[in-house]
Amino acid sequence: LADKVGLLSGGQRQALTLLMATLQKPDLLLLDEPTAALDPSTASKVLGLIRTIVGEQGLTTFMVTHNMADALSMGNRLIMMWEGRIIYDVRGAEKDALSVEDLLRKFEEVSGSALDNDRMLLG
């Protein structure tokens, strides 16, 4: 507790921020790129912490991510946006059956464009 926040690692800061944001059990938890700029190991730990806290507290959570594997593995609904509009909205068993490749195909089908940014394809 005596450590200065500025001296914490990125993952430690993300974890601390998540804990602070959920102390009062918010009506809606907004997570904007919660694993951005984190190495894969730390990102996995942060996602695990998110799953635990959200699950234990039963929080309604809206997570923004460009990582399609994370989008598929987290939550019960996936909304894909492009150029400011919703192009795909899926939930439940249909979402659970999807792969990153399925999402890429759906994006290309609906948008008419192919994704070429490796960051979006991580998984």
Segments from the language model and where they lie:
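Conserved beta-strand-loop-alpha-helix hinge in the C-terminal portion
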Residues: 85-111
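Short loop immediately C-terminal to the Walker-B catalytic DE motif
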Residues: 35-36
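Helix N-cap at the start of a conserved alpha-helix in ABC-type nucleotide-binding domains
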Residues: 40-42
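Helical segment within the ABC ATPase nucleotide-binding domain
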Residues: 44-57
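Catalytic Walker B motif of ABC-type/P-loop ATPase nucleotide-binding domains
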Residues: 29-32
